[in-house]
């Protein structure tokens, strides 16, 4: 069972290009060569989320979902981590590798879902639900993680909740993922915070059904950050890395409708060139497109390596508290 209530939601600042350097006359191939040189010189590793632009995904040493990137950050022997994702991901890399220097190439790479919860709003919810164990999705700030018992990703959220000794859970901040978890773990009483990922929340089942009329034989794969009606229309519900595994379950299927941020199509097409991947459209007829994930370009990575911008720093007390919640998460196996 679950209980969803609404907090006051902070609005993420607009993506800004204030810090984006301009190199209009440098061909991409030359820029990539310079990045490769600087990467070796700095003993750096470049990590990229599956939602990044194709050029960044192809350049990265490792591309994956939040959990996979967290594991990679914790295990790397590189001196410098350049994290091509959004701010909370770079923070998590710093938390898990406090001795490494971690850089976010573009300061505009925020997250509206992470902005939907603050330590103060979490405290309010703790007062409303005393005795509940706080499970926080990694799409959150380091300060919120530090005030949580354990974190989770979309790849292990169900296993994390099942692993807890308590029957009462406060799940934050994504209500759609929280609902999905509550359905999979009905034996626990789950109170659900009311944040959303705007990119996923815009999608409606009617839009998915319209796409299915064009491709009736298609397999639908949805991210659990999608609304409940979209999840119910899907054949598979999983994280982005889980989507790669899900495709392998349908060896005879040729067409897949993918209900997540459009950047995932690139990874799927690379892995399965003989299959067709159709991006699910939002209710306003547009691709599911996260502006924060798409703000990082090749020149941002170049200047991050060249000028060592922009380094992630965290208060030691916050870092230690957040580390405990992340390490507890990483001790739990993946769901998908």
Regions of interest found by a model, annotated:
Residues 2-258, 264-265, 269-336:
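Active-site loop-to-helix "anion-binding N-cap" substructures in soluble metabolic enzymes
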């Amino acid at each position: 069972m679950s209980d969803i209530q609404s907090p006051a939601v902070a609005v993420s600042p607009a993506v800004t290009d204030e810090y984006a350097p301009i190199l209009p006359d440098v061909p991409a191939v030359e820029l990539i060569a310079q990045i490769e040189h600087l990467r070796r010189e700095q003993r750096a590793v470049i990590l990229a989320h599956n939602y990044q632009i194709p050029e960044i995904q192809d350049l990265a040493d490792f591309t994956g979902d939040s959990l996979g990137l967290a594991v990679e950050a914790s295990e790397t022997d590189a001196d410098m981590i350049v994290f091509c994702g959004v701010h909370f991901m770079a923070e998590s890399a710093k938390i898990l590798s406090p001795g490494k220097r971690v850089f976010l190439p573009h300061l505009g790479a925020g997250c509206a879902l992470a902005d939907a919860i603050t330590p103060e709003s979490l405290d309010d919810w703790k007062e409303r639900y005393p005795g509940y164990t706080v499970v926080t999705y990694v799409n959150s700030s380091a300060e919120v993680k530090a005030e949580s018992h354990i974190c989770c990703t979309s790849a292990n959220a169900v296993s994390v909740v099942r692993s807890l000794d308590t029957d009462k859970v406060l799940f934050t901040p994504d209500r759609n993922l929280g609902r999905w978890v509550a359905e999979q773990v009905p034996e626990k009483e789950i109170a659900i915070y009311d944040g959303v990922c705007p990119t996923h929340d815009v999608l409606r089942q009617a839009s998915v059904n319209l796409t299915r009329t064009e491709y009736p034989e298609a397999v639908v794969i949805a991210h659990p950050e999608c609304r409940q009606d979209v999840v119910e229309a899907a054949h598979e519900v999983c994280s982005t890395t889980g989507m790669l595994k899900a495709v392998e379950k349908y060896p005879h299927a040729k067409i897949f409708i993918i209900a997540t941020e459009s950047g995932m199509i690139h990874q799927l097409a690379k892995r399965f060139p003989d299959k067709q991947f159709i991006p699910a459209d939002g209710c306003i007829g547009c691709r599911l497109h996260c502006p924060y994930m798409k703000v990082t370009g090749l020149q941002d990575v170049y200047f991050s390596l060249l000028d060592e911008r922009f380094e992630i720093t965290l208060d030691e007390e916050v870092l230690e508290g957040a580390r405990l919640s992340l390490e507890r998460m990483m001790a739990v196996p993946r769901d998908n």
